């Protein structure tokens, strides 16, 4: 008999996927989610919120949530992909949806190819150049509705996707690609928040589905109130024009109401994030009490949080970490300048995809120059006051209130200038109260 012992390998215990537990269903809690969604759907219908296609989108999303909720966890994302692709055909039509999917598969094929990363980037730049030519010339035999949707899907998120892909170890996943780019609300909302790829993937069922979905319901409700307020302000401002009111009154109301119309953007962003939450994606807040900002930099952090995070990740941090050895203040100022300049040109790029033409105007240049200059001043002030103990008391609260009022008033004036077609038109408005 052999005395050699046979050593069996010890099997490692499998790590349980906590997301499966977080996707556990509950009839009562499901009903508590479905009831407010039904009320929101009724509100959309009664008040004709947005365009007719929005109601169709909401029906698809809410019905999709009702089905996805009861599916086993492993089937949830495949179902969402099928729902999103089918929704493209329903909302955009056969030709546009088919071309979008074909473009997506072409892009993924390049990304997934085994060639060096720099050559993949070069191929994607070539695809971009062809699309830019098609958008600018209109000579391709494709529907004109294709280009704005294609741009809204890929123009910014592709930058983040490639950045994260370069820094990850594994290959690109087709499932991750489709869930990230073919987001159902994006077919309707062309002005879309720049969702971070890592945040999007990391947030998938990172908390209990009922908690995340309830947050989504709340954000959809908040976005709905923003859109209703936007409609009210938009309709109201036309009543305050000379000779019905004094010129000074008309100018003041128009300036304030023009700034308040940003409620439409924040309302749409809240609804988009809320819809994603229904399917388990724990999305961060898109906007946070931006009318209560105490400075320009505070406003930058609050007004479009996803864009701020996008710029910090792609522009600010790379510049900051390269320059910080030459001085922290210098690194922060240069990083801020690069962020403002990049934001300006990316807004021009966005306008091209949505409208089909480049927009360089004196209003835009002045807006971003003034905003950037004040942001640099704020960076310097924050740097000099860093480390000081925070103060409290009534004088501090009064000063903070004054800062909020001053920031709001200044941004309202600057926003009215930015919204005018030209400086001549803006000066005429300030003089006459008419625009």
Predicted feature locations:
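Membrane-embedded transmembrane alpha-helical bundles that form the catalytic cores
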Residues: 2-435
């Amino acid at each position: 008999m052999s005395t050699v012992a046979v050593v069996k390998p010890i099997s490692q215990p499998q790590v349980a996927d906590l997301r499966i537990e977080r996707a556990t269903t509950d009839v009562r809690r499901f009903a508590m989610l479905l009831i407010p969604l039904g009320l929101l759907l009724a509100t959309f219908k009664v008040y004709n919120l947005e365009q007719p296609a929005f109601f169709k989108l909401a029906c698809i999303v809410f019905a999709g949530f009702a089905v996805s909720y009861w599916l086993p966890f492993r089937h949830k994302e495949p179902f969402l992909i099928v729902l999103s692709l089918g929704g493209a055909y329903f909302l955009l039509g056969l030709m546009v949806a088919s071309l979008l999917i074909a473009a997506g598969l072409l892009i993924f094929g390049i990304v997934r190819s085994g060639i060096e990363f720099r050559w993949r980037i070069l191929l994607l730049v070539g695809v971009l150049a062809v699309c830019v030519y098609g958008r600018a010339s209109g000579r391709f035999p494709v529907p004109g509705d294709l280009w704005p949707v294609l741009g809204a899907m890929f123009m910014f998120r592709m930058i983040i996707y490639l950045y994260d892909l370069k820094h990850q170890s594994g290959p690109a996943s087709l499932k991750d690609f489709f869930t990230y780019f073919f987001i159902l609300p994006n077919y309707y909302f062309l002005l879309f928040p720049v969702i971070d790829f890592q945040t999007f993937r990391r947030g998938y069922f990172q908390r209990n589905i009922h908690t995340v979905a309830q947050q989504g319901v709340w954000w959809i409700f908040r976005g709905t109130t923003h859109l209703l307020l936007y409609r009210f302000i938009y309709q109201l401002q036309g009543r305050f024009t000379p000779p019905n009111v004094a010129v000074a009154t008309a100018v003041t109301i128009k300036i304030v109401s023009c700034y308040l119309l940003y409620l439409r953007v924040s309302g749409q962003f809240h609804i988009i994030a809320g819809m994603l939450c229904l399917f388990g994606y724990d999305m961060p807040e898109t906007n946070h009490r931006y009318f209560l900002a105490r400075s320009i930099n505070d406003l930058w952090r609050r007004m479009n949080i996803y864009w701020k995070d996008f710029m910090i990740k792609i522009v600010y941090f790379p510049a900051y970490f390269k320059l910080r050895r030459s001085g922290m203040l210098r690194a922060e100022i240069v990083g801020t300048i690069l962020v403002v300049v990049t934001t300006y040109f990316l807004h021009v790029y966005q306008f091209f995809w949505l409208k089909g033409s480049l927009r360089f105007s004196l209003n835009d240049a002045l807006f971003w120059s003034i905003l950037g200059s004040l942001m640099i001043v704020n960076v310097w002030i924050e740097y000099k006051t860093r480390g000081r103990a925070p103060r409290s008391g009534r004088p501090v609260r009064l000063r903070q209130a004054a800062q909020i009022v001053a920031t709001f008033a200044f941004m309202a004036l600057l926003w009215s200038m930015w919204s005018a077609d030209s400086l001549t038109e803006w000066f005429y408005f300030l003089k006459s109260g008419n625009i």
